[in-house]
Structure formats: C-alpha cells, structure tokens
Design a protein with these regions (language model features):
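Active-site loop/helix belt of alpha/beta enzymes
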Residues: 59, 65-177
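Active-site-proximal beta-alpha core segment in soluble small-molecule metabolic enzymes
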Residues: 1-111
C-alpha cells in the first residue's frame, strides 16, 4: 500500500512474521529504506540468515514493550540485552535502534492517565538505549509513538522519532479519549 503510493522510507511497525520474510525482503528492494521489527531470538536469527542468503542488508529495530504487554522485549532484561547484542553483531543487519508503542494509552480515561503512559513510554526506551550505549552498543534511533501520548507529552528528550499514527487526522475516537 505505502510502497505503491510512493512512500520511500517505511517501517513495518509490528514484529515481523517469519513466514513473510521472503516477501518483505523483496519489497525492501523496491523502496529506499524498509525497516523491520523483531522481539525474539528466532526472529533475529531468521532475518539474519535471510540477509546472508540473499546478500541483502536488513534494517532492523528492536521492539520494546513499554507496558502494553502485547509485543516487544522487556527493557533492561537479559533477553533484551541479548537481542540487542545479536542485532549489533550481525554482519548483514543494520541495527536501527529501539522502537515502542504506548498502545495502552488507548485505555486511559483522562489526560493525567495518558500523560503517565507517555512518561512510561519514553523512559522505557530512552533508559534502555542509555544502558545499551553504556555497554558499547550503538543505538541510532529511539522511536516512540501513539496518538494519545503525543497529544500530552512535554518531554521528548532522548527520542529521535515520534510515530503518532493518526495524529494528523485526529478522528472522533481520538477526541473521545
């Protein structure tokens, strides 16, 4: 969809489905930049193996769970550190950094609750990025975003990218929360 509309820098903002890797690697050759998300050792190994087999670089973010509990690694956990190390050491992977989504902000009932999620969202990835950098791992990007949290946040320190999905349209659903 986005590639057909001539978008040239695309992030698949959900952890990669391993069965779709061949299709995704093909698509990556049609745009200027295509970034995948991973949150498991199997995903890192599978993306790395396909990149090697195809002699095609893969741009990959590590998905971080900032409290939503749906996907991503728990920041500062041994598992999270291991995956970041695997990504940074993989020969054919360009480790893009950390990405999170405060999806639980959609369950909030007021601005104060949303603001608390916004703080949690930012601190989860910024703190983890700092810990990785302390270990010598380069973390180029720190990406956050949900429309509700972007509407109330006043501190983006340490963040390099925001992705407030439907912020530009701000539909009735957004206005309701």
């Amino acid at each position: 969809f986005f590639g057909a509309a001539d978008f040239r820098d695309i992030t698949l903002a959900v952890p990669v489905s391993l069965g779709r890797l061949p299709e995704l690697f093909d698509f990556a050759q049609q745009v200027d930049a295509f970034h995948l998300l991973v949150d498991s050792e199997l995903a890192v190994s599978s993306v790395s193996a396909m990149a090697v087999d195809r002699a095609q670089r893969a741009s990959v973010f590590l998905k971080v769970d900032c409290g939503y509990g749906r996907a991503g690694v728990v920041p500062n956990s041994p598992h999270a550190f291991r995956l970041a190390e695997m990504l940074s050491e993989a020969e054919w992977i360009d480790f893009r950094g950390l990405l999170t989504h405060g999806g639980h902000s959609y369950d909030c009932k007021n601005r104060d609750e949303i603001r608390a999620v916004a703080v949690q969202e930012r601190l989860a990835v910024v703190g983890f990025a700092d810990a990785l950098r302390h270990r010598g791992i380069v973390v180029p990007e720190v990406s956050i975003g949900s429309t509700p949290t972007m509407c109330v946040t006043d501190d983006l320190s340490g963040v390099t990218e925001i992705r407030p999905g439907n912020y530009v349209l701000f539909d009735q659903f957004q206005a309701a929360i």
